[in-house]
């Protein structure tokens, strides 16, 4: 069959993280959608948001956004020849997000054994892991982007730091704690080892970063290789449990609560935020430097979405952006469609899922799919 339009393609995604954002955007641009779901974790996609009713002229079903569910016993089974052949038979373009990385848990296999066309640069995904070489810190250095000071040795701690250690039971989650001295680092680390949250090795391998006091803003960018343009699709901030609950308490009660509860930083979602327009130019320039560094060091560089998770720090009389985390793939931020930035560019607000689908649709039209997939 000769492929002619988006109707001949299916947009595929792992059933987790931001799959609905991907699927809604794809449906709105006339694509078929497929979610790879683990058995027993499928109702969100196979029932509650399943496509229903006849398609409209745009290719959009009257209700829902998931056309088809492909079942696997474990998400890692997506690497099997059987599942890959099925995805290729359906002419799928696969959209990677954080859960894809986490559940497959094998970047070498993603790069070398997953042969379904992937929207984006697969080589960038592993940068998210701070233990990789190179990693996100290296890319930020190459791009001359400011990030929190790191301490390689806890004996050098001379200010308030945030310690990020891999959890024992959930390896892709990190256990966080604060310390302001080597003694406090040792005390707090031992406490979490005793509770079973982290291991001794996890503490030895922990990332120790200066705690930056500022306002959290995630800059969700999209780089279009077709238009050679960087776009700010939207901005948001994290919601974390039980941290958000602690912050709602008056300070004396926060101190009292920590006698019985440990503060945790489990991500539970995002809230849309806006920026002062005076900060947009700096944010865009930082994004451009990131794109340029990736193109020079990790060809073909950035393709599509990425997020620079940042803190806005007051440096009188200006504001300064400090990037504390990089998401080199589709962000888990469906609420960014509520921010105005894509609307300023396109005349209507776009979700990241819609922006990705627009790029794929244009690449099909220009016969340049190979330019946006790896």
Where are these regions (language model features)?
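N-terminal phosphate-binding or glycine-rich loops at protein starts, especially the Walker A/P-loop
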Residues: 6-29
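Beta-strand scaffold of nucleotide-dependent catalytic cores
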Residues: 209, 217-254, 320-327, 336-338
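A long amphipathic alpha-helix within ATP-dependent nucleotide-binding catalytic cores
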Residues: 247-320, 359-374
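Conserved N-proximal alpha/beta basic substrate-recognition cap immediately N-terminal to
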Residues: 45-52, 63-161, 168-171
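Active-site nucleotide/adenylate-binding loops and adjacent lid/helix of ATP-dependent enzymes
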Residues: 12, 126-217, 222-233, 277-284, ...
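Short N-terminal binding/cap micro-motifs at the start of the first secondary-structure element
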Residues: 19-24, 42-44, 171
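C-terminal active-site "lid" helix and adjoining low-complexity regulatory extension at the edge
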Residues: 3, 317-374
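Short internal beta-strands
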Residues: 31-40
């Amino acid at each position: 069959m000769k492929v002619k339009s988006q109707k001949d393609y299916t947009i595929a995604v792992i059933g987790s993280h931001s799959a609905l954002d991907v699927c809604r955007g794809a449906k709105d641009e006339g694509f078929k959608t497929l979610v790879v779901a683990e058995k027993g974790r499928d109702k969100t996609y196979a029932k509650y948001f399943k496509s229903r009713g006849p398609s409209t002229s745009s290719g959009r079903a009257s209700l829902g956004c998931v056309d088809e569910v492909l079942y696997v016993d474990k998400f890692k089974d997506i690497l099997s020849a059987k599942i890959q052949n099925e995805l290729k038979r359906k002419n799928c373009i696969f959209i990677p997000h954080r859960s894809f990385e986490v559940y497959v848990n094998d970047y070498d296999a993603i790069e070398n054994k997953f042969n379904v066309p992937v929207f984006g640069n697969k080589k960038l995904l592993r940068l998210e892991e701070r233990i990789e070489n190179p990693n996100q810190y290296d890319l930020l250095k190459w791009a001359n982007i400011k990030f929190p000071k790191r301490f390689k040795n806890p004996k050098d701690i001379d200010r308030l730091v945030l310690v990020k250690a891999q959890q024992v039971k959930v390896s892709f989650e990190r256990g966080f704690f604060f310390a302001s001295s080597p003694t406090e680092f040792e005390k707090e680390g031992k406490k979490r080892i005793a509770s079973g949250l982290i291991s001794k090795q996890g503490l030895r391998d922990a990332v120790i970063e200066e705690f930056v006091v500022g306002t959290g803003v995630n800059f969700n960018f999209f780089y279009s290789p077709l238009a050679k343009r960087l776009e700010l699709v939207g901005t948001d901030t994290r919601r974390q449990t039980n941290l958000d609950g602690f912050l709602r308490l008056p300070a004396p009660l926060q101190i009292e609560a920590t006698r019985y509860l440990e503060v945790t930083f489990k991500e539970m979602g995002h809230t849309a935020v806006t920026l002062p327009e005076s900060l947009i130019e700096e944010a865009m320039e930082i994004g451009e430097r990131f794109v340029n560094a990736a193109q020079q060091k990790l060809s073909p560089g950035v393709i599509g979405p990425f997020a620079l998770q940042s803190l806005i720090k007051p440096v009188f009389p200006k504001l300064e952006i400090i990037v504390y985390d990089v998401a080199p793939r589709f962000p888990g931020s469906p609420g960014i469609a509520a921010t105005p930035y894509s609307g300023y560019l396109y005349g209507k607000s776009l979700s990241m899922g819609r922006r990705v689908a627009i790029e794929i649709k244009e690449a099909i039209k220009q016969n340049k799919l190979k330019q946006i997939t790896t």
